[in-house]
Amino acid sequence: YESHWDKEKKQPRSKSVMAFGYVHELISDEIPDPVAYYTDFVAEKNKERAAAFTEETRPRAFVAPVEYNLGQFLLYTLLEELNVKEVIDILAAQMRFQFRIYDMIAQLIFSRIIYPCSKSKTVSSVFPHLYNSSPISEDQVYDGLSFIGGSYKKYIELFNHCYEQHYQRDFSNVFFDCTNYYFEIDLPYEDKQKGPSKENRHDPIIGQALLLDADLVPVAMQMYPGNESEKPYIRKVIEEMKSRYKVSGKTVQVADKGLNCARNIYAAVKEANDGYIFSKSIHGRNLSEKEKKWLLLENEQNIWKDYRDKDGNLLYRLKSCVDSFSYQFKEIDPETGRDVVKTFSVKEKRIVSYNPALAKKQKAEIQKMADKAANYATYKAMTREDLGDSAKYVKITNKDKNGKKITPVIGIDKEKVNEDLKYAGYNLMVTSEL
């Protein structure tokens, strides 16, 4: 039998592909056990059919396409103007590739603009549709990327040099950001390490830092180990990239709350005379009670500006303030070797937004996590792996009113649930750029 999904009836259906007959009629000297024989027969036919289906549906990288994409001509002209082809071919000459590295780079750039997708799908589904493209296989793309990745800074310097022959760089402000990527490795190696990603996973990741000029044209890029904290690394990377590429302008660090810490703000504003645009967490102890109260406040001094669609439905709300805010952080005194607390203040603009659609989504997620946490009635039945993010709503009481140890009692942290529900839909941005 063969099963398939019936779209009209919206249910699985089966059809007979081949009938063998009754067991007692199939018994013979050649087939003493028809059940075992035809079980193996069906398994073999299924393998053949699966192999044939895979071959029929496998994307062909070099099949002549019916239509071509022409949208890359603007970028094609820019690459031709930069005149990097000859130098790139010289850099790759030692490898004796059966394809041109420049052609691979150009086609990957064009494909990223036309239809961003995985490298495998790019080769099979996008390359063939590029007008006047070169036939480059998936294996060749990975070989070429591995070669470029070993000395990627050379290529960045080449493109920077050629770009500056034609265009004036604006370094009055430069922007910095970093992110990380998940990838597959058997063992950690150099900058490929296991560490926490933005999705709170601890799978192998690698970090990437990017520096842009005032026109948002990339200046520098640097990879760093995924098991290193981004917070101290941001300072090191900015210093290295600005020094390497002779950038003297003010750097505005743009980052999410993962990089927002007092030490980075101090390094940006006080040490380097730079700026920052950070998102800031509104939960936990990141904000004082006074600051949290301001988020929800609406009066003559705290006016929200509403943005609505053409039908009058609220899309989002914004309000802002400018004030001096105090920060503090611990660092080791180089002379005594002891921890010292450094306190400083900075004039900062804070922008808070409220999105009703986001609030609805977050409230549903909070309620779902709270309900999940409520299902664990005993301490033994509860593990952090089972709870996941719901663990933050679990309250464990292991002492009585007199401070005496008791059997752990599991409960819901209603105060935490109510606080998260109250601030659902709100986001906070802080910046030195007034």
Provide a role label for each language-model segment.
Residues 1-103:
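Conserved glycine(s) in the ABC-transporter nucleotide-binding domain "signature"
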Residues 85, 89-434:
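Anion-binding and metal-coordination hotspots
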